[in-house]
Amino acid sequence: MYDFAIIGSGVAGATLAKELRYRYKVAVIEKGKKPSYASEGKNVEINYVYGLGGSGVYSLGNAIKTEIKGYKIDKDIYKEIWEELKIKAPKDDFLNDIDKAFIELGFEKMEKFIDFDRCNKCGECARKICKAKWTPLNYLKESNANIITEFNIKAINYSNYYEILDDKGRKIKAKNLIISAGGINSPRILKKMIDDENIGKNLFIDTFVTVGGILEDSYLNKDISMLVYKKYKNFMLATHYSKLLINEIKKDYKDVKEKDIVGIMIKIKDENNGVVLDNDVKKEITKEDFKTLARGICKATKYLYKLGVDDIYTTIPRGSHPGGSLSLVVDEFEVREGLYVCDASLFKEALGVPPIVSIIALSKKFVREIL
């Protein structure tokens, strides 16, 4: 029997496994194996990754420290994260000309958990695993946990210990259970165990769009996306090369080359009005979200015009940071004795910035102050 079973091998699950490794026998349960994208939602497309390492495997390596409402994080935890992930901003000689042009317009360099000396600027951070970038797989390797993949949970029973069963008849027994399957799947798993009408509510996704156009020889496709950014009150702008954007542009300019596409992501701190259902996710763009997106698009468009872009195109609204979906149900990590939740589903409101270092910080806090 395990001391702890952790459901989910993403940023939170991997951090927990690493933090618990010295004192406890730990199992990490993962639904998938090879990381694959999943997409849900109709009005706003919500993307996440299932598989070993979760969405963090295909992150852009961004590190932004921000306040987490309801959770005070000790400064030493952030210092530790910066050291463990070797977080730093790129040197000037790493920047492409397009990055430098944005900096002249008031953007700043993004700190990232990427070894810039090893990065070959393939532009494939969101689609390929590489050794230049930290991912949750690094923590999993350090954890010494028993990692069980392709485990599709069918039921979870409790009788002085937790018994997790999958659809192949496998059973895992543990004294304690931590659900860390992310903003979409954690509420679905918890719903197998308790009945609460608020499970799945309060969902946010950090809604974003990418706007851009044609700028010859900008070579943003051979750069790390979000390498430079500019932060505003409820939104941020960052350089972003998007396949969806080039598809829109090609409707008018069929022969346009990828090297000639420049884009800016507008990521907003959206309202938490979404809900995770058993087989669906509902998330609308509220009036306030629309206003925030419009302000961001207006700012981004002005920067693009200054760079020399004439025609502006935009992608559909999407979201890749689902969270908040258990914040109305779980208070301070514990559901009941021996049953916990720790991941972005606990966030009470959208961060509006890349959340990985915040999730790591939350997970470290949980192990050190609660367990």
From Swiss-Prot:
Transmembrane stretches, start-end: none
GO biological processes: thiazole biosynthetic process
Stored Pfam families: NAD_binding_8
InterPro entries, A to Z: 4Fe4S_Fe-S-bd (IPR017896), FAD/NAD-bd_sf (IPR036188)
Protein name: Uncharacterized protein MJ1450
Species annotation: Methanocaldococcus jannaschii (strain ATCC 43067 / DSM 2661 / JAL-1 / JCM 10045 / NBRC 100440) (Methanococcus jannaschii)
Domain 4Fe-4S ferredoxin-type: 110-140
Gene Ontology molecular function: any one: iron ion binding
